[in-house]
Amino acid sequence: MKPNYSIDIAINCFRPGGGMESYTFDLVRGLNAHGIKPTVFAAQIDTTIPEYRQVDTHHVNQKKIPKKLRPFFFSMQLAKLRQNRNIPLIACNPSDYADIFVCGGTHLGYLHNMGKTPNLLDRLIIRRNRTNYSTAKLIMAHSHLMQHELINLYGVPSEKIHVIHPPADTARFYAKPEEIPATRARYGFKDDETIFLFPSTGHTRKGLDLLAEFFEHTDLPIKLAVAGSPLPRPMDNVIELGFCKNMPELYRAADFTIMASLYEPFGLVGIESILCGTRVVFSDNMACTEVMNENAEIGR
């Protein structure tokens, strides 16, 4: 029987991108699997992706708003578009009055871990976060680390927070050992080299500088393969792959997935890598380690 209700989802960009965009796609696919076609409110909408056919959309027009100010106007624009809509809202971005606010990171936590002093824009973001959290009915934290930050940095009541780790798509991410040799050849990975995969759309936060310092000065037969944002400069022993649409095969082709994040509210790449049969080398502050055992396997 088809459900007789709908759900609204708010996200800045409904297109391939970072963690929250990927999470939104997982959410859309999951809702569709239960017969629910959600309505997505976004400032940027990619009409070419398969998930576009699984949703209704409303465009939040921000073209006339200066880029740095757009996130601060989104919530007000969203409220106008949703006027008289008695439909639950899941906020996957900093939107107010959400029925469920998905917390995949806090700005105070980010500044603390990055060692940054807040400027005017940071203070505005922190103020916006406080209204997001105070007006939300429930907050879904991606990790116990996020729960800790919400309670201790923002004073959010603990009973308002539910820790639910992000889902991983096991229909996409799984081991396929028989295809590894051909996939490695296609990416140009040599048989006598150990490949460390570094998926990143935010190199400073993810620890590229620390990793590059080692990889550029080693004589070991190893390579760092960077998938995502462009490199800031050419680097020895570092392969620039650019944005990769087929991450499952890339995980399988690598020998390890590595990250040295300064701040990682969860880090779904760790779970995806292990599902694909590839071991991980992570800094112990990455929240995805909450669901791994000492052998870097997914706990149950």
What is each PLM-predicted segment?
Residues R279-F282:
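Short hydrophobic beta-strand element within catalytic cores of glycosyltransferases
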Residues I151, A168-A185, D192:
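Acidic anion/phosphate-binding donor-loop and adjacent secondary structure
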